[in-house]
Amino acid sequence: MKRILITRPRAQAEAFAETLRLAGFEPVFFPVIEIQPIESNVALERAVSKLGCYDWVVFTSVNAVDIVFENYASAFLQEVPALKFAAIGPKTAEALQARGIAPDFVPDEYIAESILPGLGDLRGKWVLLPRAEIARKALPEAIFEAGGIPHEIAVYKTLPAQLDLEGLAALQSGVDVITLTSSSTVHNLVIVAKRNGLDPLSLPGDPLFVCIGPITEQAAREEGLVNLVTAKEYTTQGMIEVIRKMEVS
């Protein structure tokens, strides 16, 4: 049975792991990052109090949805004339729907830049972007170039996770596949490997790295990782399909 290393936060990995089990694989938890909400977020509080000033709210991750709605669900569920919601990726859209918000736009391609055409004419319009403290600038820059006014607000931090000894032991003994679901998982996996005497470019078992999308793949290549494949659909289900096909071949 092939062993699949899951590097995303444990709380977000359970459903992924269960799907892997049902597909006949052995999931191994090795979270290399954790998500920490930004506390006493004055900037977010101010933005929420003035939701009527915005034309769009764009959620780029489930993390952002969870954290924003944890404290401000009632404000977002109030009817705000002209305010529209966009979500990047089906899981982000599902997270919004679970909280009573039907996204007005979800792009077919699950990367930030792909959302721009669906936002329409942005000239003079305000776009609220609740996101990670460290995030790619492609989306706000594209909004600005289109004449819009992007308002980025950091709502969470991505931090290195506490070392999981069982996961480390699996990595040291060799796994078949390592799943990478964000640039942060790439960078922190490399750091953890080096700190524990492993060469990330030559890991035991010569594992296949499966990336969730092109941005993650780019981060992996920049770290020098090889033996990479990327899901055609930028979701964990898409990653599982890649793993299945590789097993057959």
Regions found by a protein language model. Give the residues of each.
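Signature of uroporphyrinogen-III synthase
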Residues: 1-249
